[in-house]
Each structure stands twice: as C-alpha cells, then as structure tokens.
Amino acid sequence: MFSKIIQSYAKGNLIVQICIGIVLGILIGISSKEISEIANLLGILFTSALKAIAPMLVFILILTSICTKDFSQSGAKIKNIIILYIVGTFLASACAVLANFFFPVKLVLDGVQTATNSSPTHMSEIFKDLLFKIVDNPINALSSGNYLGILTWAIAGGIALKHCSNEAKQVFIDINEGVLKIVKFIVKLAPFGIFGLVANSVAQTGAQGLLSYVKLLILLVTTMLFVTFVINALIVFFYTRKNPFPLIFICLRHSAFFAFFTRSSAANIPVNMALCAKLGIDKEFYGISIPLGATINMAGAAVTIAILSLTAANTVGIEISLLQAFLLSIIATFAACGASGVAGGSLLLIPLACSLFNIDYDIAMKVVAIGFIIGVIQDSVETALNSSTDVLFTAICSKNELNYNIK
C-alpha cells in the first residue's frame, strides 16, 4: 500500500503537486501557527538539501560542459549563432538588472535582520574581494559555498581536461548524470518543502509575504516578455533588416506554446527541429544549432538569476554599484549557460550570483526556495523564452529564404 502511494507520487505531475502544496500551506498558515512551525521543518529540510547539493552541481556541471563539448568542427554559421546565443543571453540579463533597478522588489524573509554582510563600494575593494574569492582553495570553496571559487576551479579543470581521453570524459559525464539524478530527486520533494515554507511564511508575515512573491513573479514575467517582444525583435531587425514580428509570432505559436507546458528545452528539441524544417532551414544547420541552443541559449534563465540575485540584495539592504551590476550581467550570462538540462537549474545557480554581493548563503538559499514556489509559472515562461529563441536565432542565422506560411 505504502509503495503504491510512493509510486503514484513519483509519477505525478510536479506542477500540480506544488500547487497543492501552496494551497495547503496557505490554509495551514492561516488556521494554525503551531502546526505551521512544525510544517516549517519540511521547508528547512528542503532548503538544506538544496544548499548541500548546489555547490557540487555547479562544479561538476560546468567542468563537464567545458571538457566534453567540441566546437572545433563548427562552421561560420555555427560560430555566428554561438555568438548570437551569448549576446542574446547577456542582453536579457542586462535588461533584468535594469528592470530591478527601476522596479525593486523586497522579500519578507526570516533572518534578514541578522544579515550583517555588506557589499564593497569602491572599485578596488570589489576587485580585491573578487580575486580572493577566485583563488580560494577548491575544497573550501565547495564546503563554504564560495561560488566564484567553484566557478573558477570548474572552468580551470574543464580546460585542463579538454584533451583527456574519451574514457576519462565519460567518467565525468557519468558523475554529472549521477549528480543530476540527485538534484531531480530533491526537486521531486519540492511540494513538501514548499508546503512548509508557505505555511510558515503565511503564519509569520500574513498576506504581506505572499504579496512580495507575487510582485517578484510579475517582475520576472514582465521582463521575459520585454526580452521576447523588444530585445529579440531588435536583434532580428538588426540582423535581417526586416519586420521581426511575423517570425517571432511563428516561434511563439509553434515552439513557446509547447515549451511552456513541457518546461524543458531539451524535451522541446524535436518540436523545434520540426518547426525549422517547416521554415525551410537547412537540416545540417538546425541539426546542430537547435540542440546547441537548448544547452547554451538561456535568456530566460539569465533573467531569473539576475532578478532573484538583486532581489536578495534589496532584501538585505545592499546597494549595488554600476560596476557590480555589469559584473552581475556577465555572471548571469555564463551561469545561465550552465543551467540547461537541470530541473530548476537557473534557481540553483542564484547563490553563484549572490556571492558577488557577499550575501549570506542561507539567505540566498531562502530566495532559491521562494523561486521554487513561484516556479510553477516562472519556469514555464522561462523555458518558453529559451526554447522559442533557439528557433528564432537559428532562422535568422541560416540565411535561408524562410517559409512564413505555416499553419
């Protein structure tokens, strides 16, 4: 009987389960403060599990990605689209930074008043702080959650192992798969953690806490829509000197719609390839560019990482300088490229960006947990933006005469 319940839960729809957890959490938070405190243990366990796996995830994900990917045989078109993917992701992260400056959001979190970390303000202090974090001992970086140090050693290790044997690379691929399975298991437990977090949040802060979540979600979705209809439109127009919106709406209708519900760029690859074929793009080109885009074209993830990191900074009262904002845009761009193929990958990379501002690791992970609460909508919109942009950029880089008469 118990095993059947576990199997039924494991096969269940995660979105539906999270929604149930949110509703039950609100009801418990309103009705009983005592039960909410007990339920909060589930939230603490969930965030603790995320804190434990996140450093290892970032390290092995980036190291494996660098040492196993081979672009040496790429032609001019592939090199162009790689550049376009990275530029598009950077512009998305820059838009997210600007959006947060104009419409800052503060979250209601327990423990924020105890946060004593301050962000360096002078350029010399910023670079000194960055350099010391970068050259941190790799073991210490992993144990303390120093994500800049983790990122540095992962990149260095990936480059150093670039020319190792295929058998050695396969070992890292297998380790990467093992870590991803652990992450998927933890994420599958998200409904229980979210239930506890929501119950405690409602009991402690009332409607004010939930309202801050809604404001954050609106900021995220609005920024992603701005990237879709303004930034991407400008990129297409600059590249083709043609009206970008017919192609954008085709990509939204035939790619974003499916990606919204699958919540996976990888799962949407066959859909995108079929759309590219209908558009009349060379198979040799989109056969490489679409899977590549599902790996490194992460505009939506960059928006999520940048906005939630700055929201964490706003919450603890840290003022961000222009230089730090620029550095955040760069970090969010490359962190987003490492978020592919991971359930909640963009959320788990938020501590990497938060480390730029000396934000306490516990607070960063609380923001990650809130990201899972709003992720029912945020992750769907993020994936829709990521996946539809794969086709959009593939189409304009292909130089083919496109077929716009698609039903």
From Swiss-Prot:
Membrane in keyword set: yes
Highest rank taxon of the organism: Bacteria
Disulfide bonds: none
Example of a GO MF term: neutral L-amino acid:sodium symporter activity
Intracellular or extracellular location(s): Cell inner membrane
UniProt topology in membrane: Multi-pass membrane protein
Keywords of this entry: Amino-acid transport, Cell inner membrane, Cell membrane, Membrane, Symport, Transmembrane, Transmembrane helix, Transport
Gene Ontology process terms (BP): serine transport; threonine transport
Reactions listed under catalytic activity: L-serine(in) + Na(+)(in) = L-serine(out) + Na(+)(out); L-threonine(in) + Na(+)(in) = L-threonine(out) + Na(+)(out)
Signal peptide segment: none
Transmembrane segment boundaries: 12-32, 42-62, 81-101, 141-161, 179-199, 218-238, 245-267, 288-308, 330-350
Free-text function comment from the UniProt entry: Involved in the import of serine and threonine into the cell, with the concomitant import of sodium (symport system).
HAMAP family xrefs: Ser_Thr_transp_SstT
Sequence similarity: Belongs to the dicarboxylate/amino acid:cation symporter (DAACS) (TC 2.A.23) family.
Protein's UniProt name: Serine/threonine transporter SstT
Record gene name: sstT
